[in-house]
């Protein structure tokens, strides 16, 4: 099994000419812990259970004025699996399924941002989401392969863009 901690901090700014007049920028901090527990591990097949707890802090400025300041907390649990054919012309199939429960807290944001959210997207509060993925890679030669994949997510309400 593997237990870990992750921390990141970055600053963003919008550089497109379409948004230059906004001077949009801000810092984003993220911290979390994760646990990965192998369930099955053979030469061909691998299955593991993943659990993640993450908190994010966002601050968005428009024209040097703070427009929004909010947090996002997320607990995710799920399964990651893969299988591989070990013969020549081999292939690999992988899948993942993660169930998450989270919370967006806008209480430190401006009144304008909270009111706009309440009148439109309504992202504040708790949410649940299910993320899934399935991929298959077929190898033809050492240098040539074909990859087909599908990924998606379902949520019980509108999500913040960070989710």
Residue map of PLM features:
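C-terminal outer-membrane beta-barrel translocator/porin domains of Gram-negative envelope proteins
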Residues: 59-163
